[in-house]
């Protein structure tokens, strides 16, 4: 796989935006496939997240007492996690092929935004100047780690309105990681 420098990364990102714009002008697109049923790890993680979320609710920091597992956004975070699974490394420099996969996230986002407002996410770093990204949270249901994970999600201020969470737990080099995003129903 070819590694991209910053200029190639930005050029490819711009090209992806243009391609998405042009695709929106064409015929009907195929809707994303429905997400898979949650695993035991995902269910355990939601329970641990909700313990922390409840404390935030009691302190008046969030709108809803708990997050409901809703895997409608899992397809998007699974695309991201799949890049690491395919590369078999928790720190990865994005390639042209990876960027093509990431274009699929926009389809999910467009579909979700018809019903939901999107909040924060946690589990994957922002790209560095060299286009490197990393999985940032190894799977854990321990209070301290879950608190850090929730704090990352809450980094986006509107996440306080979240009702739902989608989770994906990629396994890379024998370690399980956690990726999540939160969202809530659009008000009419």
Identify the residue ranges that each predicted region occupies.
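Short, well-ordered surface patches within globular domains
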Residues: 32-109
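A well-ordered secondary-structure block
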Residues: 99-188
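Alpha-helix boundary/capping residues
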Residues: 16, 80, 84, 153-157
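N-terminal secretory signal peptides and thylakoid transit peptides that target proteins
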Residues: 1-20
